[in-house]
Amino acid sequence: MMKSNSIAVLADSCNDIPQELLDKCHIYILPLMINYKDASYRDRVDITPEQVYERFQEEIPKTSLPLPETIADTFAKIKADGFNQVIVSAISSGLSGTCQAIRLLADDIEDMQIVVIDTLNIAIASGFVALYAAEQIEAGLPFEEVVSKTQAAVKQSTILFGVGTLEYLMKGGRIGKVSGILGSALNIKPIISCNEDGIYDTVAKVRGRKQSIQKLIDMTREKLGQHKNYYLSICHGDAYEEMLVMKDQLKDLVAGAKIYAEGQISPVLGVHTGPGLLGIGIMV
Protein backbone atom coordinates (compact mmCIF):
# COMPACT_ATOMS: atom_id res chain seq x y z
CA MET A 1 0.00 0.00 0.00
CA MET A 2 1.18 3.48 -0.87
CA LYS A 3 0.54 5.11 2.49
CA SER A 4 3.54 7.42 2.51
CA ASN A 5 1.26 10.39 1.96
CA SER A 6 -2.10 8.67 2.53
CA ILE A 7 -3.44 9.23 -1.00
CA ALA A 8 -5.55 6.53 -2.65
CA VAL A 9 -6.79 6.23 -6.23
CA LEU A 10 -10.28 4.96 -7.02
CA ALA A 11 -11.56 4.21 -10.53
CA ASP A 12 -14.97 3.04 -11.68
CA SER A 13 -15.05 -0.33 -13.44
CA CYS A 14 -15.48 1.24 -16.90
CA ASN A 15 -11.95 2.66 -16.59
CA ASP A 16 -11.03 -0.80 -17.92
CA ILE A 17 -7.74 -1.11 -16.05
CA PRO A 18 -6.44 -4.70 -16.25
CA GLN A 19 -6.31 -6.52 -12.92
CA GLU A 20 -2.51 -6.79 -12.90
CA LEU A 21 -2.19 -2.99 -13.16
CA LEU A 22 -4.85 -2.47 -10.49
CA ASP A 23 -2.83 -4.71 -8.18
CA LYS A 24 0.53 -3.19 -9.07
CA CYS A 25 -0.65 0.40 -8.64
CA HIS A 26 -2.97 -0.28 -5.67
CA ILE A 27 -6.03 1.22 -7.39
CA TYR A 28 -9.46 0.62 -5.87
CA ILE A 29 -12.35 -0.24 -8.20
CA LEU A 30 -16.00 0.80 -8.01
CA PRO A 31 -18.25 -1.46 -10.10
CA LEU A 32 -21.17 -0.28 -12.21
CA MET A 33 -24.15 -2.64 -12.49
CA ILE A 34 -25.47 -5.00 -15.17
CA ASN A 35 -29.16 -5.78 -14.82
CA TYR A 36 -30.94 -8.74 -16.37
CA LYS A 37 -34.64 -9.41 -15.84
CA ASP A 38 -33.86 -12.10 -13.26
CA ALA A 39 -30.70 -10.77 -11.57
CA SER A 40 -28.22 -7.93 -11.22
CA TYR A 41 -24.44 -8.24 -11.31
CA ARG A 42 -21.50 -6.04 -10.37
CA ASP A 43 -19.42 -5.16 -13.41
CA ARG A 44 -16.16 -7.16 -13.56
CA VAL A 45 -16.89 -8.66 -10.12
CA ASP A 46 -19.85 -11.01 -10.58
CA ILE A 47 -19.92 -11.24 -14.38
CA THR A 48 -17.40 -11.47 -17.22
CA PRO A 49 -17.53 -9.97 -20.72
CA GLU A 50 -17.75 -13.48 -22.16
CA GLN A 51 -20.91 -14.17 -20.16
CA VAL A 52 -22.52 -10.97 -21.45
CA TYR A 53 -21.75 -11.75 -25.10
CA GLU A 54 -22.97 -15.34 -24.71
CA ARG A 55 -26.36 -14.14 -23.45
CA PHE A 56 -26.91 -11.47 -26.12
CA GLN A 57 -29.10 -13.80 -28.19
CA GLU A 58 -31.55 -14.26 -25.34
CA GLU A 59 -31.32 -10.87 -23.62
CA ILE A 60 -29.46 -7.57 -23.89
CA PRO A 61 -29.19 -6.36 -20.29
CA LYS A 62 -29.53 -2.83 -18.96
CA THR A 63 -26.71 -1.09 -17.14
CA SER A 64 -26.84 1.27 -14.18
CA LEU A 65 -24.67 3.38 -11.92
CA PRO A 66 -22.77 2.01 -8.94
CA LEU A 67 -25.17 1.50 -6.03
CA PRO A 68 -25.03 4.29 -3.40
CA GLU A 69 -24.26 1.75 -0.67
CA THR A 70 -21.40 0.36 -2.79
CA ILE A 71 -19.94 3.86 -3.18
CA ALA A 72 -20.23 4.50 0.57
CA ASP A 73 -18.76 1.09 1.45
CA THR A 74 -15.85 1.63 -0.94
CA PHE A 75 -14.90 4.95 0.64
CA ALA A 76 -15.24 3.34 4.09
CA LYS A 77 -12.86 0.56 3.02
CA ILE A 78 -10.35 3.10 1.67
CA LYS A 79 -10.52 5.00 4.96
CA ALA A 80 -10.12 1.81 6.99
CA ASP A 81 -7.02 1.01 4.94
CA GLY A 82 -5.43 4.21 6.23
CA PHE A 83 -6.06 6.72 3.45
CA ASN A 84 -7.64 10.12 4.07
CA GLN A 85 -7.18 11.63 0.59
CA VAL A 86 -8.70 10.10 -2.55
CA ILE A 87 -8.49 10.87 -6.24
CA VAL A 88 -11.36 9.34 -8.21
CA SER A 89 -11.16 8.71 -11.95
CA ALA A 90 -14.70 8.63 -13.38
CA ILE A 91 -15.82 7.93 -16.93
CA SER A 92 -17.23 10.84 -18.91
CA SER A 93 -20.18 12.72 -17.45
CA GLY A 94 -21.30 13.05 -21.08
CA LEU A 95 -21.87 9.29 -21.24
CA SER A 96 -22.77 8.28 -17.68
CA GLY A 97 -24.09 9.66 -14.40
CA THR A 98 -21.35 7.80 -12.51
CA CYS A 99 -19.20 10.90 -11.95
CA GLN A 100 -22.11 12.87 -10.48
CA ALA A 101 -23.24 9.95 -8.31
CA ILE A 102 -19.78 9.62 -6.77
CA ARG A 103 -19.53 13.38 -6.19
CA LEU A 104 -22.89 13.47 -4.39
CA LEU A 105 -21.88 10.67 -2.03
CA ALA A 106 -18.35 12.04 -1.54
CA ASP A 107 -19.76 15.38 -0.35
CA ASP A 108 -21.32 13.62 2.65
CA ILE A 109 -18.16 11.85 3.78
CA GLU A 110 -16.34 13.44 6.69
CA ASP A 111 -12.62 13.34 7.50
CA MET A 112 -11.65 12.52 3.91
CA GLN A 113 -10.47 14.80 1.14
CA ILE A 114 -12.01 13.44 -2.08
CA VAL A 115 -11.52 14.87 -5.57
CA VAL A 116 -13.60 13.31 -8.36
CA ILE A 117 -12.09 13.85 -11.80
CA ASP A 118 -14.41 13.78 -14.81
CA THR A 119 -12.12 12.19 -17.40
CA LEU A 120 -14.46 13.17 -20.28
CA ASN A 121 -13.46 9.81 -21.69
CA ILE A 122 -14.24 6.12 -21.56
CA ALA A 123 -12.54 2.76 -21.06
CA ILE A 124 -8.75 2.67 -20.75
CA ALA A 125 -8.49 6.34 -21.80
CA SER A 126 -10.13 7.03 -18.43
CA GLY A 127 -8.04 4.31 -16.83
CA PHE A 128 -4.86 6.02 -17.95
CA VAL A 129 -5.90 9.06 -15.87
CA ALA A 130 -6.10 6.82 -12.78
CA LEU A 131 -2.76 5.20 -13.61
CA TYR A 132 -1.16 8.61 -14.10
CA ALA A 133 -2.43 9.72 -10.68
CA ALA A 134 -0.98 6.56 -9.12
CA GLU A 135 2.36 7.32 -10.77
CA GLN A 136 2.43 10.82 -9.27
CA ILE A 137 1.59 9.43 -5.82
CA GLU A 138 4.37 6.87 -6.16
CA ALA A 139 6.74 9.77 -6.93
CA GLY A 140 5.81 11.27 -3.54
CA LEU A 141 4.04 14.41 -4.72
CA PRO A 142 1.65 16.19 -2.33
CA PHE A 143 -2.10 15.80 -2.83
CA GLU A 144 -2.76 19.21 -4.41
CA GLU A 145 0.00 18.69 -6.96
CA VAL A 146 -1.19 15.17 -7.80
CA VAL A 147 -4.69 16.58 -8.36
CA SER A 148 -3.57 19.46 -10.59
CA LYS A 149 -1.24 17.29 -12.68
CA THR A 150 -3.89 14.58 -13.05
CA GLN A 151 -6.54 17.10 -14.10
CA ALA A 152 -4.14 18.45 -16.72
CA ALA A 153 -3.47 14.89 -17.94
CA VAL A 154 -7.15 14.42 -18.84
CA LYS A 155 -6.59 16.29 -22.11
CA GLN A 156 -3.64 14.05 -22.99
CA SER A 157 -5.71 10.85 -23.06
CA THR A 158 -7.56 9.60 -26.15
CA ILE A 159 -9.77 6.66 -27.06
CA LEU A 160 -10.24 5.46 -30.64
CA PHE A 161 -12.51 2.55 -31.46
CA GLY A 162 -14.53 0.84 -34.13
CA VAL A 163 -17.54 -1.40 -33.56
CA GLY A 164 -18.91 -4.40 -35.40
CA THR A 165 -22.28 -2.66 -35.67
CA LEU A 166 -23.76 0.63 -34.44
CA GLU A 167 -26.88 -1.24 -33.31
CA TYR A 168 -25.84 -1.50 -29.65
CA LEU A 169 -24.76 2.14 -29.28
CA MET A 170 -28.12 3.17 -30.76
CA LYS A 171 -30.13 0.83 -28.51
CA GLY A 172 -28.32 2.07 -25.41
CA GLY A 173 -28.86 5.73 -26.30
CA ARG A 174 -25.09 6.31 -26.33
CA ILE A 175 -24.79 7.17 -30.01
CA GLY A 176 -23.74 10.78 -29.25
CA LYS A 177 -22.74 12.61 -32.40
CA VAL A 178 -22.11 9.36 -34.29
CA SER A 179 -24.71 9.16 -37.01
CA GLY A 180 -26.83 6.04 -36.74
CA ILE A 181 -27.65 6.20 -40.42
CA LEU A 182 -24.10 5.42 -41.50
CA GLY A 183 -25.25 2.77 -43.89
CA SER A 184 -24.75 -0.88 -43.37
CA ALA A 185 -25.61 -1.03 -47.08
CA LEU A 186 -22.47 0.98 -47.84
CA ASN A 187 -20.54 -0.89 -45.14
CA ILE A 188 -19.30 2.42 -43.75
CA LYS A 189 -17.42 1.97 -40.48
CA PRO A 190 -16.91 5.03 -38.26
CA ILE A 191 -13.87 5.43 -36.04
CA ILE A 192 -15.27 6.82 -32.79
CA SER A 193 -13.66 8.93 -30.08
CA CYS A 194 -14.82 11.19 -27.25
CA ASN A 195 -15.01 14.90 -28.06
CA GLU A 196 -14.12 17.76 -25.69
CA ASP A 197 -17.54 17.39 -24.03
CA GLY A 198 -16.93 13.70 -23.42
CA ILE A 199 -19.52 12.57 -25.97
CA TYR A 200 -18.99 10.00 -28.73
CA ASP A 201 -18.08 11.57 -32.04
CA THR A 202 -16.92 10.29 -35.42
CA VAL A 203 -13.29 11.13 -36.18
CA ALA A 204 -12.98 9.08 -39.39
CA LYS A 205 -15.12 7.03 -41.78
CA VAL A 206 -13.87 4.07 -43.77
CA ARG A 207 -15.44 1.29 -45.80
CA GLY A 208 -15.30 -2.22 -44.40
CA ARG A 209 -13.77 -3.97 -41.41
CA LYS A 210 -10.29 -4.35 -42.86
CA GLN A 211 -10.03 -0.62 -43.56
CA SER A 212 -11.39 0.11 -40.09
CA ILE A 213 -8.57 -1.86 -38.47
CA GLN A 214 -5.97 -0.21 -40.71
CA LYS A 215 -7.34 3.24 -39.89
CA LEU A 216 -7.04 2.56 -36.15
CA ILE A 217 -3.41 1.52 -36.68
CA ASP A 218 -2.65 4.58 -38.83
CA MET A 219 -4.29 6.99 -36.38
CA THR A 220 -2.37 5.47 -33.47
CA ARG A 221 0.94 6.07 -35.23
CA GLU A 222 -0.14 9.58 -36.16
CA LYS A 223 -1.20 10.48 -32.61
CA LEU A 224 1.92 9.07 -30.99
CA GLY A 225 4.19 10.74 -33.55
CA GLN A 226 7.61 11.32 -32.00
CA HIS A 227 6.41 10.93 -28.40
CA LYS A 228 8.73 8.78 -26.30
CA ASN A 229 6.87 8.91 -22.97
CA TYR A 230 3.42 7.43 -23.57
CA TYR A 231 0.83 4.95 -22.37
CA LEU A 232 -0.75 2.60 -24.93
CA SER A 233 -3.58 0.08 -24.82
CA ILE A 234 -5.12 -2.23 -27.39
CA CYS A 235 -8.53 -3.55 -26.38
CA HIS A 236 -11.35 -5.58 -27.83
CA GLY A 237 -14.92 -6.69 -27.28
CA ASP A 238 -15.27 -10.31 -28.39
CA ALA A 239 -12.65 -9.77 -31.14
CA TYR A 240 -9.51 -11.30 -29.66
CA GLU A 241 -7.90 -12.56 -32.88
CA GLU A 242 -8.26 -9.19 -34.58
CA MET A 243 -6.79 -7.50 -31.51
CA LEU A 244 -3.72 -9.71 -31.89
CA VAL A 245 -3.40 -8.63 -35.53
CA MET A 246 -3.43 -4.98 -34.44
CA LYS A 247 -0.90 -5.69 -31.70
CA ASP A 248 1.46 -7.29 -34.22
CA GLN A 249 1.13 -4.26 -36.52
CA LEU A 250 1.93 -1.95 -33.60
CA LYS A 251 4.57 -4.11 -31.88
CA ASP A 252 7.25 -1.38 -32.02
CA LEU A 253 4.93 1.05 -30.22
CA VAL A 254 3.86 -1.64 -27.74
CA ALA A 255 7.52 -2.28 -26.90
CA GLY A 256 8.20 1.44 -26.39
CA ALA A 257 5.23 2.22 -24.15
CA LYS A 258 5.81 3.37 -20.58
CA ILE A 259 2.61 1.53 -19.68
CA TYR A 260 1.02 -1.03 -22.01
CA ALA A 261 -2.33 -2.67 -21.37
CA GLU A 262 -4.44 -5.05 -23.42
CA GLY A 263 -7.54 -7.11 -23.02
CA GLN A 264 -11.29 -7.26 -23.21
CA ILE A 265 -13.43 -4.25 -22.32
CA SER A 266 -15.63 -4.37 -19.23
CA PRO A 267 -19.01 -6.13 -19.38
CA VAL A 268 -20.86 -2.79 -19.03
CA LEU A 269 -19.05 -1.32 -22.03
CA GLY A 270 -19.65 -4.55 -23.94
CA VAL A 271 -23.40 -4.12 -23.44
CA HIS A 272 -23.29 -0.70 -25.10
CA THR A 273 -20.93 -1.53 -27.96
CA GLY A 274 -21.73 -5.15 -28.82
CA PRO A 275 -19.39 -7.83 -30.16
CA GLY A 276 -16.66 -6.84 -32.59
CA LEU A 277 -15.21 -3.78 -30.87
CA LEU A 278 -11.57 -2.93 -31.44
CA GLY A 279 -10.05 0.00 -29.60
CA ILE A 280 -6.89 1.94 -28.90
CA GLY A 281 -6.14 4.00 -25.81
CA ILE A 282 -3.34 6.57 -25.84
CA MET A 283 -1.94 9.01 -23.30
CA VAL A 284 0.97 11.26 -24.27
Region roles according to the model:
Residues 11, 88, 236:
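Active-site-adjacent beta-strand anchor residues
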Residues 2-5, 14-28, 33, 39, ...:
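Mixed-charge interfacial surface used for oligomerization/domain docking
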Residues 58-59, 65-88, 92-101, 147, ...:
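Glycine-rich phosphate- or other oxyanion-binding loops that anchor nucleotides, phosphorylated ligands
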Residues 7, 84-88, 230-232:
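Generic beta-sheet signal
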Residues 7-70:
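N-terminal glycine-rich anion-binding loop in soluble enzyme alpha/beta folds
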Residues 47-52, 81, 103-108:
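A short glycine/small-residue-enriched secondary-structure motif
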